[in-house]
Amino acid sequence: MQSLPFDLVTGLGFGAFLLLLLALPLAFWAVSSQARTGIVQLLVALANLLLTSQLVLRWWESGHFPISNLYESLCFLAWACTLTQLLVERSWPSPIVAAAATPMGLGCIAFASFALPDQLQSAAPLVPALRSSWLVMHVSVIMVSYAALLVGSLLSLAVLLTDRGEALELRSSSIGSGGFRQSMRVGSDGVLQLQSIRLSTGEQLDSLSYRTITVGFLMLTVGIVSGAVWANEAWGSYWSWDPKETWALICWLVYAAYLHTRLSRGWQGRRPALVAVVGLVVIAVCYIGVNLLGIGLHSYGWFLG
C-alpha cells in the first residue's frame, strides 16, 4: 500500500486529544452550573470524526483493518468510547454523562499518543495468525463491547457520586421510558390510576448504565464466541486459558453477575453500580495489564527487545 506521512495519522489523533481535553473541563463546568452541553457534544463529535479519519487513513496506509497493535486498538477504543458517549447523550443530554464518559476517550487517545514507544505506533504487516476475516469480526466486536462496558461502568460510578442520600426506585418499566417511571395511585373516585413520575438524576444514570452495559455484555459474548472459533482455526483449540482469555472470561462473569443481580435479585442503584465499578477494574487489567506484562498469544507487546 502507498505510505502516508506518519505525522498525518498521529496528528489526527493529537487533534482528537486536544478536542477532548477542551471538552472535559467544559463538561465539569456544565455540571456545576447546570448549563447545556451542546458545545461539549460538538467537541466530542469532532473528536470522533478525527478519530474516524485517523483509522481510515491508517487502514489505507497499512492495508489491513487498523486494530493489529496496541496503538491502533487504543485509537479504535477511543473512537468507540466517543461514539458510545454520543449515543448515550442522545437518550439523555445531561452534562453528567459528558463529565463521566469523556475521560475514557481522552485517556485512551492520550495513552496511545504519548505513552507508547514509537515502534508500537508504527504500522507493520500483519503476522500470519492475524491474516483472517475473523480479525474484524472478533477484535472489533470485543473493542466495541469494551467501550460500551467502560462507559456504562463510568455512569455507574456517577450513580455512586450522585443522590447519595436518596433511595433509587428504578423499575424495569422505566427502562427506555424517556426519563419517567410508572406508578399506580388511587384516584379520588377510588379507581386505580397510572401516573408518570420523572426519574431523579441517579435513576436516570442507573437506567442509562444498565442499558449500556447490557449492550456491551451481549457484544462481549459475541466477541468471545467468535474468538473461540478463530482460535480453533488458527491454533487448533477453542480455549487455551491464555491470560487474555482468562481475564476476558472474568470480565464476562463480573458483568453477568451485574445483570443477574438486577434481573433476578431486583438490585438497583448503588449495589449493582459497585459491581459495575469492579468490572471497570477488570477490563483495565484484561486490556492493559496483560499487554504491560507482554505475555500470552493475545499480547500486543509492550517490550520490544
Curated annotation (Swiss-Prot):
Transmembrane segments annotated in the record for this chain: 11-31, 37-57, 63-83, 96-116, 141-161, 212-232, 246-263, 275-295
Source organism, top-level taxon: Bacteria
Keywords per UniProt: Cytochrome c-type biogenesis, Membrane, Thylakoid, Transmembrane, Transmembrane helix
Pfam families: Cytochrom_C_asm (PF01578)
Location (main, coarse): membrane
Membrane protein topology class: Multi-pass membrane protein
Any one of the GO BP annotations: cytochrome complex assembly
Residue pairs linked by disulfide bridges in the UniProt entry: none
SUBUNIT field: May interact with ccs1.
PANTHER family: CYTOCHROME B_B6 PROTEIN-RELATED, HEME EXPORTER PROTEIN C
Protein name: Cytochrome c biogenesis protein CcsA
Source organism per UniProt: Parasynechococcus marenigrum (strain WH8102)
Biological classification of the source: Bacteria, Bacillati, Cyanobacteriota, Cyanophyceae, Synechococcales
